[in-house]
Amino acid sequence: NGTIIRTDLYGFNNFNYDNLMIAALLSFYMRTNSTKELINKLYETSKTIISSQDDKDKFRTDFYLNSLRKYKLPFTGVDVMRIFALNKASVVVDNKTGERKPVPKGLKQTSINLQWYELLEYELPDINEKEAELYNEIPNLKGMNINQLNKLVDKWDRFILDEYIEPMMYYNLNDVFIVAEIVRLYPEEIKSRYAISKAYDVNVLNSSRSKTADILFEKFYSKFSGLAPEQWKGKKTERTAMSFKKVIFPFIKFKTKELQDLLDKLYKTTIYRVNKDAFSENVKIGDITYTLATGGLHSQDVPMELYSTTPYGDYLTPSSTGGKPFTIYHFDVASFYPSIIGVHKVAPAHIDTNAFCNLISWMKQKRVDVKHSEEEYIDGIAKDILALVLKIVINSIYGKLGFEKGDLYDRLAVLKVTVNGQLMLLMLCEALELDNIHIISANTDGIMVKVYASQEDKFKEITTWWQNITGMQADSDVVHSLIARDVNNYITQFRSKGKLKIESKGALNPMMYSLDLTKGYSMPIVAQAIENYFLKNKPVMDTLQE
């Protein structure tokens, strides 16, 4: 009926700046005797905020800033910088302390990801005679000439003359429109925060996916365990030495000597950290060399262009040069790491194992039920948004096991997931290669396989055996074409419902900069030219010159 039920103010870093400034404005508006006094109060507030932001402890504990945070604003602030994790877009490591410090990504950098039409920076012109007169009223600047003032007065301490207002407002409005564009382009990301907040009685309006996962996990785990948050939060399990004897599952077995030797070596391995340099082994199966590390399995791929040569509707496939036609399958393990946690009861030592693993299994099953449900709304949340929410929480769990400042920290649990995940995939690769079914590529949660018609039944038999022995579930999708630079950067065309569906990853994804706003904008035209060249037979220069 046109009645306003709430007012929400969207901004970029408004959680740490704009909201505090508005609180100061409303607080001092009736307590100052003149506009000049009010402006001075706001100026001092702004300086306090800016000077404190590099010192996290000071920013959190400052009495004045905390009083502003407690001020009841007449609107709800929504910070898109936080929602898209742009306040922690990258990390730098302190050379002296080794501390990892988050680095924010500014609105201008983000606007490049959006391909915003106008990239603006605004700088005040040099101080002129008219402005110089104003500084004569400031004791420590009185009597200085224009050159001296331009050297001494910081740009944030300048007076704003009337003639500066119009270009400054144009610049400010451009910033506002960029924020509006972020909200317009990513409505589901924004809507999900409202839906989650309402359905689960939490506040995630200013939370990134990772923070949202933390908040929901806290709520879900407390329900499953029967423990209040204060009874389990704030704990972690420290490890000094981690023996793989305590890590490897008993069903991990190999048939070939090379892999048996690898397994024996792993049983004798002890590591003291879980970073990238802590552990690495190479092993060859057939023609493919695989690298095992603390993060996940990778095959050492060479650049390749491959096509399934079996017929597919009216789509042309390259000649098999007289050989037998074959199909490339992508054997993808569903939610691999969370599945290992749930099926094989992997949990931090300080957490209730049954409650933790039952929660993981419940979320996985709930997500499957949601995806296949015919209902538009489930638990008061739109079906697609609920599926996204569950995916966010499920996929975050593994990462939380290795986050030192989190409540799930236990590095042995990390190794149980990653090491066994890799060994499981190697069991599958070995079994397939022993039956002359050749692996094309292997990554953390799946493999690509070349299968001839005569091998179809054997392929299904081996993959079914593998799923039964590991407890994992997987799907085999047909790959029409694979264009790969290496294992992490590729273009894939999948055969689906009589059509071709393109999926790209890494440097060969021309839209990566828009899928993840924290990423840099790195020559997407190159990825587009590669895609057009291989999939549309379009010369590279035609793409570049368009």
Question: What residues fall within each predicted segment?
Answer:
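Conserved acidic
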Residues: 2-546
